[in-house]
Amino acid sequence: MLKIFEKLFGSKHEKDVKKIQPTIQRINELQRALASLSDEQLRQKGRELKQKVRGVLEPMELEQQKLFHQLDSPNISLDEAESVNNKLDDLAVAYETATASVLEEILPDTFALVKETCARLKGHTYNVMGRQFVWNMVPYDVQLIGGIVLHSGKIAEMQTGEGKTLVSTLPTFLNALTGRGVHVVTVNDYLAQRDKEWMEPLFAFHNLSVGVILTSMHPALRRAQYLCDITYGTNNELGFDYLRDNMANTPEEMVQRKFYYAIVDEVDSVLIDEARTPLIISGPVPNADNSKFQEIKPWIEQLVRAQQQQIAAWLGDAETRMKTNATDPEAGLALLRVKRGQPKNSRFIKMLSQQGVAKLVQITENEYLKDNSSRMHEVDDALFYAVDEKANTIDLTDKGRDFLSKLSHQDSDIFLLPDVGTEIATIESNAALSTNDKIQHKDALYRLFSDRSERLHNISQLLKAYSLFERDDEYVVQNGQVMIVDEFTGRILPGRRYSDGLHQAIEAKENVKIEGETQTMATITIQNFFRLYKKLAGMTGTAETEASEFYEIYKLDVVVIPTNASVVRKDMDDLVYKTRREKYNAIAQKVEELQKRGQPVLVGTTSVEVSETLSRMLRTRRIAHNVLNAKQNDREAEIVAEAGQKGTVTIATNMAGRGTDIKLGDGVRELGGLYILGSERHESRRIDRQLRGRAGRQGDPGESVFYVSLEDELMRLFGSDRVIAVMDRLGHEEGDVIEHSMITKSIERAQKKVEEQNFAIRKRLLEYDDVLNQQREVIYSRRKNGLLKERLTSDILDLLKDYSDTIVKKYHKDFDTAGLEEQLMRDLSIEFQLDRATFEREGIDAVVDKVYETALTFYRRKEESLPADIMCQIEKYAVLTVIDQRWREHLREIDSLREGINLRAYGQKDPLIEYKQEAFRLFITLLKEIEAETLSLAFKLFPIDPEEQQQIEERQRQSAIRQEKLVAQHDVAESFVGLNDDDEPLPAQPITTEQKPGRNDLCPCGSGKKYKACCGQ
């Protein structure tokens, strides 16, 4: 029905493009008029456009600065500050409106200027990534359409070879005229550097500066790159710089400006594929025990072997039974147990391709899943552990716990978590216990729970490492390190680690050095990072299938841009085989046939393992070929450049994200163009579309086909039932192939299932992170205020007012003057005297005023006794140190909350609602602690006397010895658990000289820890 309406009235994309056509005509008219100008006159046109934009924005920026200066005034009242903040809010809205309006006005002139500049550069030679490049690019009309779509803050879907890199220069140039900085985001350092060097001549012609952010770049150089009009960089580098800026200790350490406009290349890869993985900067856990995995590894290896032996017995039993009765229920149960115990077992996968086997397993599983899985325990009880491959989880069974308890010579109860709620109630109701006894019993219970939960967690992670993560598939081992392979691009992700101890478990499994355990110091999801930009746009060859997600999560509309030349590539139906062996033989035979006739072929694979298997098969047939996967990444540009030459065979792991066009060599067009051969369907239709899109660029001929087997991951997990039923009905024999549009559609339905599941995961992740994001905004705003504001005295005194009110109310009920005096001395180091009669006689407000005035007098005397710059340092140190320490602890508590929150579902509660409520309570507590500790530190910190310096340095040396591991690994920050972070050493900090700190006070050695956890041990 929808297609009928589209034929009658035109599709949404056709209407979008039609609206833009008048602007395109205007741009071309203006460009023809510019052709008669000299180069200098053309440059002058560019300067005039920039002056026009700056003429609108500069007065508003000056007004903004004036208002900020008013806020910094120490004499400003609370009412005046509120009025200024309201003016700033109104001005910010007016500023964005004015920016959008003036850019819209000059868009045709600017695009015409860029097009004419491209025409003038034609024929010039430039050096790009060490190669000579001749400029021959002038934007077509469809590229101008793409540029307008990007400027509008939308996603432009443009086919491979349509010149997306050039298209991005149009809105980039236009928005760079504001002077606010434009970020062009790519998927890797190579493309960021290449695109910067490639497009720089165009921007340099008009004196626009261009920078690039690369991994391992020094902070000072990063700052210079961000100050450029246009900055190229990867999403990870931009995101980590944002997190590091919010951990900076001085304004000079910050590198980024405010976020204005970003264009994301391969936007689907960045905003969808990578969105499941948050960016995390982490540091090591003090006193962490890295030997825990080695201790339990021998037990787990024996457990895995025992399960494998049991699986082999069940497979043998099932085969025997099915010889006499193909639908034997006992055979079905045995095979279901194999599926639950070792789903990747190669013998089991081969059996599933036999007639009737998959159907028997499905019928058996449905039987045990009835009534809300009430009988599934009958299946799992025979296993040592149950594997849910789709949910990526493993559950240790009672049988497994008994097995481990015998190996460890301990009671099986050590693998069971105590019911804390019930146990606490029992302790509380025990009248025989004193208050002290109850506290000790509770502490013992919490320690027991912590020890057992950690042990179970480590066992679960090791079982995952052995059962769900395979070498050369999810990861590779290089130079004694476990390196993650990007599932979407096939690239190695250097510096990244799986979180929650999983990476350490894999390191233990592979017998390489186990790196230190880490804790989160700063984190943000990709979704929330890109929401920081005032305007966001993206381009890709494949966005339409994810249009609803782009709009729902990012409010980004997708517009399909027509191609400059019609696509003539032939996309054939999938070829389906029963087993992988049959499929691989057919692929090798097809490649040999294509090479003999000289047609270049690109074989796309989904893992390193498959690419190496096919490579071995081609070598045995003496077929020359190139391999591009995570292990041969360094030859990428060279391999891609040769892929379209006559007779070339290229095997590439997930070629989709490579970002480089494959150009056809001489005589290849006549042979049918580049032949794309997919070795299996990816779980995402987009990745398959991207692979097909490598052929048929700019009207070139090409062919594409996917070879699929029922043993492939996608088919095995999500889609083979219907296909197997068809094959069974047709009496399919080994070696036969099925090619039918119905089969292709069935496979696409399976992909859609996976896409829906992944979207649900990403959406849920965002819902959880939105809670933390609101908290992050508050904390980072406070921290930035503390870092950038010249004087923080007014903020400290605001805290003092709240503190005075809170503490007086706390002790007023019992008129406890001793308690009030003691806490004021402990918290603020001030002497305060008040007799009970006065406390009773005077109202709360009067006593609050007395406390405030006494504390204020003390603080003013401190200000007078110290140089202004020292006082400023003390205030900044107090604010930043407390926020950083408490925020880290809060993130750890939030991580713990997230890990266990899903268990609330068993109590018929929505885990998300529970998470929001618990996280809010934790955050309120956090804010109170930050305010109290900041105030305390600001009052109690004093510079040390010279004669005490030697003693303090000795204490710091002792502290440094204990923290050596922390300092050495502080900079290790990885996505999945962070990315390397080269922070410079902190400047010397002011230290308190009070005689005896309290156990919960910050340690006077300057470590930032509590006294009881540092020098007070």
From Swiss-Prot:
Gene3D superfamilies: Helical scaffold and wing domains of SecA (1.10.3060.10), P-loop containing nucleotide triphosphate hydrolases (3.40.50.300), SecA, preprotein cross-linking domain (3.90.1440.10). Keywords: ATP-binding, Cell inner membrane, Cell membrane, Cytoplasm, Membrane, Metal-binding, Nucleotide-binding, Protein transport, Translocase, Translocation, Transport, Zinc. It catalyses: ATP + H2O + cellular proteinSide 1 = ADP + phosphate + cellular proteinSide 2. Coiled coil: none annotated. Residues 978-999 are annotated as: Disordered. One of its GO terms (biological process) is protein transport by the Sec complex. The keyword Membrane applies. NCBIfam families: secA. Belongs to the SecA family. This is Protein translocase subunit SecA 1.
